[in-house]
C-alpha cells in the first residue's frame, strides 16, 4: 500500500509558485498542495529561475507574481530561454498592466488576479495543465 501512495505522489504535477510576499507564498503553496499538486516555492524571480533549473523535468507549470524583486516579466523571459515550452501563469493585483498584456502576446499561458480564490486558482491551473 505504501508503494501506491508513493506512486501517486510521484504522479502529482509539480508546480513552482513564486511570490516575494511570505504570506502569499505560504498560502499559495498550501492551496496547491490541497488541490493535489506537488508545490515548490521561490521568494523572487531569480530564485524561481534557480528552482526551475534544478527541477525543470518535473515542473509542469510556473506561477509568477508580477511585482517582486527580479519581477515576473524578467523571470518569464528567462524561463522561456531555458525551456520555450514551459507553461507560465502570471499572478498580479493589477489587472490593467501593459506588461501583462505583452506577456500574453509573448506566450504566457494565463493571468490570475490577486487575491484569488481556491476555485479560481484550481480552474486556471487545471486549464493550463490540460492545454
Question: What annotation goes with each model-predicted range?
Answer:
Residues 1-14:
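Disordered, acidic interdomain junction associated with two-component signaling
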Residues 20-22:
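Two-component His->Asp phosphorelay active-site signatures
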Residues 26-34:
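Charged docking surfaces used in two-component/phosphorelay signaling
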Residues 29, 41-61:
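Acidic, metal-coordinating helix/loop segments flanking the phosphotransfer/catalytic sites
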Residues 42-43, 69-71:
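Hydrophobic residue at a beta-alpha junction
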Residues 46-53, 73-85:
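Short amphipathic alpha-helix used as the core "switch/output" element in two-component signaling
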Residues 64-65:
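Active-site residues of response regulator receiver
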Residues 74, 78-81, 89, 94-113, ...:
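Alpha4 helix (beta4-alpha4-beta5 surface) of REC/receiver domains from two-component response regulators
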